Every structure is written in structure tokens, then in C-alpha cells.
Regions:
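N-terminal membrane-targeting hydrophobic helices
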Residues: 1-194
Length: 194
């Protein structure tokens, strides 16, 4: 799996493809499925590379979307305004509950799963309907020298993290003016009109 922050370029790209989408919702939605990883590790002694319900379509479209909405509406404006000194009232407006925000949170969750899907030796995307070990990521298969899925996963993981990291650097360079507003809200602070 790409490191959680490296799911950001997909959220940013979606917001550029459709300007009506809500960037904070896409960001939070693209990060939320990985919330289960430390929880599984800390409370259930499950390996750090394991996933569960939030990495399935069933979980992402229900629990993941609900958590994403709650975090985007109630936590994101507070944290980003505290850390980056954004105008809290503008952030609350950008992060208010709307059908577009809900859809953006849902899309963020789905695209997290799709990015993970291509580079894992198993996928819970169709859980509980299909055995996760019957779904092998295309990059894992491409790089599985001699059928070694672990080697395929290692190469796919490194390659995916590298590519997403390069996209992240490109996004930062492209948005260096008003960087934080551009990459966290999607608009320059003075472009927000309410």
C-alpha cells in the first residue's frame, strides 16, 4: 500500500478533473480506509500490513464514508485552521455538509481502494462476497518474478510509493503560491466567496 499521505495525489487529481468536487472531502475520504491499520495493530495484534472492512467496497461506501463525513465536517476545519491559521468560518463553509461533500468523501474512499487494488497480493475490495486472496493486484502479477508474489508486492509497493511521491512533489511545485490553501482547501484564501 502506498503510505497513507501518498493517496493525496489521487484526491487532488479528482478535484482538478471535476471542480465541483470538495477537496477536503476527497482528501479525508482517501485517507480514512487506513485508519483501521493502526487500530487492528494496536488492539487486535494484527500485522501492520493487514486490512479489514474499510478496505472493502461495503465498508468504504458505508462506514468509511460516514467517518469521512464526520471528520471533514467537524475535525478538518478545526485542525487546519489551528495549524495553518486559515479563517475558520471560511473552512466551515467549505466543509459544510452538502451532497457534493458526501459524494466527495465516498469517491475518496473508493479511489483509495482502487489505488491499493493494483499493488497488493490480496484485496478485500469485494469482501465478504469474494475471497480476498483470489484478487491479486496487477502490478504484483507483473513483477512476480518466477511467481513470487511477495517479491511482486515489494516491487509494486516501492514503485507505487515512488510514483505517488513524485506526483506529490509535482503538486507542491505547481501550487507553491498559497501552497497550503491550494492543497488543503483547493482554492486560494481570497478566492473563497461566501
Amino acid at each position: 500500500m502506498p503510505a497513507t499521505p501518498l493517496h493525496y495525489p489521487v484526491a487532488w487529481g479528482l478535484s482538478k478533473l471535476n471542480k465541483k468536487l470538495n477537496l477536503p472531502g476527497l482528501i479525508i475520504g482517501s485517507f480514512i480506509p487506513d485508519v483501521e491499520v493502526p487500530i487492528l495493530f494496536l488492539f487486535f495484534n494484527v500485522g501492520i500490513d493487514n486490512h479489514f472492512i474499510l478496505h472493502s467496497l461495503v465498508g468504504a461506501l458505508t462506514i468509511g464514508t460516514i467517518i469521512s463525513i464526520l471528520v471533514t465536517v467537524y475535525i478538518y476545519p478545526i485542525l487546519t485552521s489551528l495549524i495553518f491559521r486559515f479563517d475558520k468560518s471560511n473552512l466551515k463553509e467549505v466543509c459544510r455538509l452538502t451532497p457534493i461533500l458526501v459524494f466527495s468523501c465516498m469517491l475518496g474512499n473508493i479511489f483509495h481502494l482502487l489505488l491499493d487494488l493494483i499493488m497488493h497480493p490480496y484485496s478485500l475490495i469485494l469482501w465478504p462476497f469474494v475471497d480476498p486472496h483470489k484478487i491479486v493486484g496487477i502490478l504484483v502479477l507483473v513483477f512476480a518474478v518466477g511467481g513470487d508474489l511477495q517479491l511482486g508486492f515489494l516491487i509494486a509497493n516501492v514503485l507505487t510509493n515512488l510514483v505517488m511521491g513524485l506526483f506529490m512533489v509535482a503538486i507542491i511545485i505547481k501550487n507553491r503560491r498559497n501552497l497550503w490553501e491550494q492543497i488543503l482547501i483547493g482554492q486560494k484564501k481570497n478566492d473563497l466567496k461566501f
